């Protein structure tokens, strides 16, 4: 079992006032570091997401027209596949 440090209350495992006082000078700097770290990470993720959404590799490729016979055949194949998957 873990032994409590001298800076922890032995019954509740909470920080003692001495530990709280020792951490006070570093709180603002640590908080600013956290904000900067989260800001940079969030900015990178946002930038990457926006750049990837602009990607339109196939935007210039024309979609060929499909006639009604082919469309009906594709619908039948789709329905048969859907039924086959539902039976599994």
UniProtKB/Swiss-Prot annotation:
Component of 250-400 kDa complexes called cytochrome oxidase assembly intermediates or COA complexes. This is Cytochrome c oxidase assembly factor 3, mitochondrial. Residues 50-88 are mitochondrial intermembrane. The lineage of its organism: Eukaryota, Fungi, Dikarya, Ascomycota, Saccharomycotina. Belongs to the COA3 family. Its main location: mitochondrion. InterPro entries: Coa3 (IPR041752). GO terms for biological process: mitochondrial cytochrome c oxidase assembly. The gene is COA3. The chain crosses the membrane at residues 31-49. GO terms for cellular component: mitochondrial inner membrane. It is a single-pass membrane protein. Residues 1-30 are mitochondrial matrix. Required for assembly of cytochrome c oxidase (complex IV). The keyword Membrane applies. It is found in: Mitochondrion inner membrane. Keywords: Membrane, Mitochondrion, Mitochondrion inner membrane, Transmembrane, Transmembrane helix. It comes from the Eukaryota.
């Amino acid at each position: 079992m873990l032994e409590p440090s001298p800076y922890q209350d032995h019954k509740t495992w909470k920080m003692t006032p001495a530990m709280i006082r020792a951490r006070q000078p570093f709180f603002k700097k640590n908080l600013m570091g956290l904000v900067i770290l989260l800001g940079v990470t969030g900015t990178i993720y946002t930038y990457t997401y926006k750049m990837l959404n602009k990607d339109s590799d196939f935007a210039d490729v024309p979609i060929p027209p499909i006639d009604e016979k082919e469309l009906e055949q594709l619908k039948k194949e789709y329905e048969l596949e859907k039924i086959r998957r539902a039976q599994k």
